[in-house]
A protein has these predicted regions:
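Thiamine diphosphate
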Residues: 1-142
Length: 142
C-alpha cells in the first residue's frame, strides 16, 4: 500500500466505496517472501519496522481507518468497514514471516505454482525465526 498511497486522495475526493484491508506484517510482504524462497533470506529493502499507523494515515486523507487488534475484533471491524460509506482502510497486524500462497515463480507456468512453504523454509522458521514483541499481539497466524 505504501507504493501507491496517493490513490487514497482520489478515493476520498471521488467518494469511492473502496475498502482496503492491509495484512500488515511490517515488510513488503511478497518481496520478503521472494527473498526467503529464492535468495536464502537475504533481505534487501523489504523490512519496514517503522511502518506508519495506517489508521491515522487513512484519517489524514479524510478516510476512515480501522484496526483489528485481536481475532475477536476481526468480524466486527470488517462488518463496520463494509457498512461505512466511502473509502476505508483496515489494518490487520499479522505475523512478520507469514507467507502468501499460491504463488507462481518468476518465469514460471501455472503448473509450477507453489502452494506452501518448502520443507527447508518451514524448518528454518520453526528453528529460530526471530519473533519480535509486536508479533505476540498479532491476530492472523498460520
Amino acid at each position: 500500500i505504501q507504493m501507491n498511497m496517493q490513490e487514497m486522495a482520489t478515493a476520498v475526493v471521488s467518494k469511492l466505496p473502496v475498502k482496503i484491508i492491509i495484512l500488515n506484517n511490517r515488510f513488503h510482504g511478497m518481496v520478503r517472501q521472494w527473498q526467503d524462497l529464492f535468495y536464502n533470506g537475504r533481505y534487501a529493502s523489504s523490512d519496514l519496522e517503522n511502518t506508519p499507523d495506517f489508521v491515522k494515515l487513512a484519517e489524514a486523507y479524510g478516510a476512515v481507518g480501522l484496526r483489528a487488534n485481536t481475532m475477536d475484533d476481526l468480524d466486527g471491524v470488517l462488518k463496520k468497514a463494509i457498512e461505512t460509506e466511502g473509502p476505508v482502510i483496515v489494518d490487520v497486524p499479522t505475523y512478520r514471516f507469514e507467507n502468501c500462497y499460491p504463488m507462481i515463480p518468476a518465469g514460471g507456468c501455472n503448473h509450477e505454482m507453489i502452494l506452501e512453504d518448502p520443507p527447508e523454509l518451514k524448518q528454518k522458521q520453526a528453528g529460530g525465526t526471530k519473533v519480535t514483541p509486536q508479533d505476540k499481539d498479532t491476530v492472523l497466524t498460520a
